[in-house]
Amino acid sequence: KGNDNQLFTDLDVTMETGQVVGILGASGSGKTTLTEILLGQLKPTCQQFRILENGKPVTAGSRSWSYVPQQNLLREYLKVSETFDFYADHHLKGSGKLTKKHRIAGIMDDLGLTEFANKKISELSGGQKRRVSIGIELLSPSPYFILDEPSSGLDALSDRNLLRTLKILAKSANKSIVVITHNTEN
């Protein structure tokens, strides 16, 4: 970003559908830059940069990625259930009410959010808000997810549970999940 530092040399990542892949690095190591390239928000400056999907080259940003940023972008005045309903209307356009309801219930249950359905976002802990942010993006039909520091605000047990849940969701829903983190614990 704005300088001539080479962040990566011969970066080669292979990811299968239903898999969770971690990108681990210290602050300033290029994790955000790589994320912006994958999302198509930044053009790579290297001579050769390719993303292959099913063995065929695709343009960065041309695929449908869901992205959960590190910062909380939730509407604090809404209840958890209202938040999921709001995003389901966007992510699940064309789906019937029953389909939306079942999808929301399944994700909320998987992420341990069912008991907080009637609480306002402003009443949740940081870790609970994080799970809501992840859950609403999991509503998306996108096969690709980037989660930026998903364990931010979570205690060690919640972090392990979240990663286990992400692995299960990746397999059961055929999602490819990229976890961006500096956390070497998990």
Residue ranges of model-derived segments:
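Conserved beta-strand
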Residues: 4-19, 47-49
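Helix-to-loop junction immediately C-terminal to a conserved catalytic motif
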Residues: 39
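The feature captures the beta-strand-to-loop junction immediately N-terminal to the Walker
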Residues: 24-26
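Catalytic Walker B motif of ABC-type/P-loop ATPase nucleotide-binding domains
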Residues: 145-149
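Conserved ABC ATPase signature
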Residues: 120-124
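Q-loop/switch helix immediately C-terminal to the Walker
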Residues: 71, 76-93, 103
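Conserved ABC ATPase "signature" region
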Residues: 99-116
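ABC ATPase C-loop
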Residues: 137-138
